[in-house]
C-alpha cells in the first residue's frame, strides 16, 4: 500500500514523523507498533480524503491490534468513512462493532443517531408517521446514551430530545 506523498500540511507531516519516531522507541512489542503505524497511515489518508486507502490501512491495523479501546477507535474511523460515502447500513454496523470494543465512545452513538434521525425525517416527508416514530425513537435511544456519556457535549441533541419529548429526565442530570 504505497502512501502518496502529497501532504501539504507541514504540521501534519511533522507530527506524523514525530509519532513514528516515538513509536519506534516505545517499550511495546513490534505487533503493537505496527498496528499503530497502520492506524496513523490510515488517519493520514482519511484526512487527505483518500478513503479507500484509509480503509486498507485500518483493516491492516485491526489484524494486528489487540487493545479493545484502540480497535474501537479504528472501527469508529472506518464507520465515519462509510457514513461519508453514504453507506449508512455499513456505518451503523461498524459503529456497533466499535461500541462492542469500547462502549465509551459517545461520538459513535451520536453519529448512529444522526442516521436514524435522517431516516425519520425522510419517512415523515413521505407521510409515513409510524416509520418516522420508529426511527426517531431509535435516534432518541442512542442519543440519550451519548448525552449520558458526554454531558453538555451535545447541546443540539439534548435540545432535540427535550423538544421532541423523547428524552428521559435523567439524561440531563
UniProtKB/Swiss-Prot annotation:
**Which SUPFAM superfamilies does the record cross-reference, listed alphabetically?**
TPR-like (SSF48452)
UniProt keyword annotation of Repeat present: yes
Query: How does this protein lie in the membrane?
Result: Peripheral membrane protein
Pfam families of this UniProt entry?
TPR_12
Question: What stretches of residues are TPR repeats?
Answer: 35-68, 72-105, 120-153
Q: Which UniProt keywords apply?
A: Membrane, Photosynthesis, Repeat, Thylakoid, TPR repeat
The record's annotation in PROSITE patterns points to: TPR, TPR_REGION
What does the record list as GO biological process?
photosynthesis
Predominant location category? membrane
Q: Where located?
A: Cellular thylakoid membrane
Q: Which residues form a coiled coil?
A: none
**Cellular component terms, GO, for this chain's entry?**
plasma membrane-derived thylakoid membrane
**Protein origin, superkingdom:** Bacteria
InterPro entries, per this entry? Answer: PSI_Ycf3_assembly (IPR022818), TPR-like_helical_dom_sf (IPR011990), TPR_rpt (IPR019734), Ycf3/AcsC/BcsC/TPR_MFPF (IPR051685)
* NCBIfam families named among the record's database cross-references: PRK02603.1
Query: What's its job?
Result: Essential for the assembly of the photosystem I (PSI) complex. May act as a chaperone-like factor to guide the assembly of the PSI subunits.
Q: Which family does it belong to?
A: Belongs to the Ycf3 family.
> What PANTHER family is this protein classified in?
CELLULOSE SYNTHASE OPERON PROTEIN C, TPR REPEAT-CONTAINING PROTEIN MJ0263
Can you say what this protein is called?
Photosystem I assembly protein Ycf3
